[in-house]
C-alpha cells in the first residue's frame, strides 16, 4: 500500500549523519588552511616576521610597516583535490577547480621628518580555506543498516511525531512501517498508531553501502590593515578581518544488493543537502622587531572570530521495490546561530644569510576546545560539551626558505598543522616550492603546494557503524602578478 502524504511540523535540530549545526561545523569553520599569494604559498605561509607580503596581513599585520612602495597583487590558483576512503573497498574521488587566493592593495607613505618612518594602509581579500572536495565511500556490511538507526529514533513516536528529516520520509516510503499497519477503512487512518515500528531491511544480512559526498565553497577574509615603522626597527600593525563562509554539501547514501529484505525492497537512496552562509569579525594585532640587520622576531595575537551563520538543510528518501518506487522529501529547515572560534597566538623568527638566503619559521598555537555555538532557537549545551571533550590545543609549525639567484628567486616551504582532536592524530602536512621574478616595478611568482592529511567520516550513528578512514590530498598551482608604484 502506498502511504499518503501527511503534513509534519516537527523541526529536527540534528542529523543522524552529523551534517548540520554541530561540533563538526565548529571545527570546520575554526580551522584555516591559507593559500594566498604565490610567494606566501611557496614558503608555506612562514611570514610571521617577514612582512612586505599581502597574505601575511592575515597572520601578522605588523608586516605592513615594511612596505616601501604602494602595491597591487592578484592571485589565481588551480586546485586538484582527491579523497581516498577505506571501507572494505578502496575508493578515490577527485575534484578540481579555479580559486582566487588574493586581491590586495597597499598604500605606502614615507614620513621623512618623523621617527615613525612609514604609516601604511591596506585593503583586500585573502583565501583562508577551500572546501571543494568529492568523497566516495563503498563497502559491504552485514552487521547494520542506516534503517536500524532510523528505526531506533522513530520508536515510541506516533506518525505525527516522527522526525521530519528521516523518520517521516522513511515511513512514507515504506523503509519502516508500523508493526501492525492495519487501516480503518472508514476513517482511512491507522488503527495501531502506537509508536511500534519495524524495518524492511535486515541489518544483519549482507548489503552494499555507498555514499557520495560533494562539497564546495570556501572561507575568505576581507582585511583592513594599518601599521607603521618606528625607525625601521619596530613594526606595529593591526588588521580588522571580516571573514565570510560559503559552504555547500550534497550527499547521496545508498543501500543495494540486499541478501535479505522484507516486502521485496531492492534498495534505497537517502539524499541530504546542506547550505551554509556566514560572516564574522575579528581583530589581529602584531609586532615585528628588527634585532639586527640579519635577524627579525615577530609576535601576533588573533582574537576569536564571532560568526553569524545561517544554514538550510533538507533530505529526501527514495525506496525501490520490485514493482514501484516511492520518494518523500522533507521540508527545508532554516537555522541561525552564532559561532565563536578560538584565540590564536603566533611567534616568528627570520634570518637573512649572505644577503641572498632568507630563512623563516612560525610557531602557532590554537585551542579548538575554546569554540562555542549559541542560538536563541537552541541551547547547544550538548554540542558545546562535546567540543570541550573532543577537541584540544593544537600546535602549528611553518618553515620557509628563499634564495635569490638573479634574475630568479627560488622558494620552498614545509608546514604541519596539529590535530584538533584530543585522542586522534589528524594532523596535516604541506610541502611547497616556487619561483619568482622581481623586476622592481612588477613581479611574477608561481608556486606548487602539496597538502596531505588524514580524517574520518561517520556514515551514520557510531552505535551502529565505525567511522570510515579518509586520506585527503590536495595539489595547488598558484600564480601572482603584482605591481609597485
Which residues make up each language-model segment?
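Short structured motifs
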Residues: 59-60, 465
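Outer-membrane beta-barrel porins/channels
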Residues: 21-35, 40, 108-485
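Bacterial Sec-dependent N-terminal signal peptides
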Residues: 1-24, 481
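Outer-membrane beta-barrel translocator/receptor signature
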Residues: 38, 50-59, 65-142, 220
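Active-site-proximal flexible loops/turns
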Residues: 9, 67, 248
Amino acid at each position: 500500500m502506498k502511504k499518503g502524504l501527511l503534513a509534519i511540523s516537527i523541526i529536527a535540530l540534528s542529523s543522524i549523519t552529523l551534517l548540520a549545526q554541530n561540533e563538526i561545523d565548529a571545527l570546520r569553520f575554526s580551522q584555516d588552511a591559507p593559500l594566498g599569494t604565490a610567494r606566501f604559498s611557496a614558503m608555506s605561509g612562514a611570514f610571521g616576521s617577514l612582512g612586505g607580503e599581502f597574505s601575511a596581513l592575515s597572520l601578522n599585520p605588523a608586516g605592513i610597516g615594511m612596505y616601501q612602495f604602494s602595491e597591487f597583487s592578484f592571485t589565481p590558483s588551480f586546485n586538484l583535490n582527491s579523497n581516498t576512503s577505506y571501507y572494505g573497498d578502496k575508493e578515490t574521488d577527485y575534484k578540481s577547480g579555479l580559486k582566487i587566493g588574493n586581491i590586495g592593495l597597499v598604500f605606502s607613505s614615507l614620513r621623512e621628518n618623523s621617527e615613525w618612518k612609514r604609516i601604511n594602509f591596506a585593503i583586500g581579500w585573502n583565501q583562508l580555506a577551500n572546501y571543494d572536495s568529492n568523497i566516495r565511500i563503498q563497502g559491504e556490511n552485514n552487521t547494520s543498516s542506516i534503517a536500524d538507526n532510523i528505526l531506533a529514533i522513530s520508536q515510541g513516536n506516533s506518525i505525527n511525531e516522527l522526525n521530519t528529516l528521516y523518520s517521516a520520509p522513511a515511513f512514507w516510503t515504506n523503509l519502516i512501517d508500523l508493526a501492525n499497519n492495519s487501516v480503518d477503512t472508514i476513517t482511512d487512518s491507522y488503527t495501531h498508531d502506537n509508536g511500534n515500528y519495524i524495518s524492511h531491511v535486515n541489518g544483519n544480512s549482507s548489503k552494499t553501502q555507498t555514499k557520495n559526498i560533494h562539497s564546495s565553497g570556501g572561507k575568505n577574509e576581507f582585511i583592513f590593515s594599518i601599521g607603521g615603522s618606528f625607525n625601521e626597527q619596530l613594526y606595529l600593525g593591526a588588521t580588522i578581518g571580516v571573514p565570510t563562509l560559503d559552504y555547500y554539501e550534497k550527499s547521496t547514501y545508498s543501500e543495494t544488493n540486499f541478501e535479505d529484505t522484507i516486502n521485496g525492497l531492492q534498495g534505497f537512496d537517502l539524499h541530504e543537502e546542506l547550505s551554509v552562509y556566514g560572516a564574522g569579525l575579528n581583530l589581529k594585532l602584531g609586532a615585528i622587531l628588527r634585532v639586527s640587520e640579519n635577524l627579525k622576531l615577530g609576535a601576533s595575537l588573533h582574537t576569536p572570530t564571532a560568526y553569524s551563520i545561517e544554514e538550510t538543510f533538507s533530505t529526501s528518501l527514495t525506496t525501490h521495490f520490485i514493482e514501484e518506487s516511492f520518494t518523500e522529501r522533507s521540508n527545508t529547515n532554516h537555522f541561525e546561530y552564532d559561532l565563536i572560534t578560538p584565540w590564536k597566538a603566533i611567534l616568528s623568527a627570520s634570518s637573512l644569510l649572505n644577503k641572498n638566503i632568507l630563512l623563516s619559521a612560525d610557531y602557532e598555537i590554537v585551542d579548538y576546545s575554546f569554540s562555542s555555538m549559541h542560538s536563541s532557537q537552541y541551547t547547544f549545551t550538548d554540542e558545546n560539551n562535546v567540543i570541550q571533550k573532543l577537541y584540544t590545543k593544537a600546535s602549528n609549525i611553518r618553515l620557509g626558505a628563499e634564495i635569490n639567484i638573479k634574475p630568479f628567486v627560488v622558494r620552498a616551504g614545509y608546514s604541519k598543522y596539529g590535530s584538533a582532536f584530543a585522542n586522534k592524530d589528524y594532523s596535516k602536512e604541506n610541502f611547497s616550492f616556487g619561483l619568482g621574478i622581481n623586476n622592481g616595478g612588477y613581479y611574477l611568482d608561481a608556486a606548487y603546494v602539496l597538502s596531505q592529511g588524514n580524517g574520518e567520516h561517520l556514515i551514520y550513528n557510531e552505535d551502529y557503524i565505525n567511522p570510515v578512514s579518509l586520506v585527503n590530498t590536495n595539489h595547488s598551482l598558484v600564480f601572482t602578478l603584482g605591481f609597485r608604484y
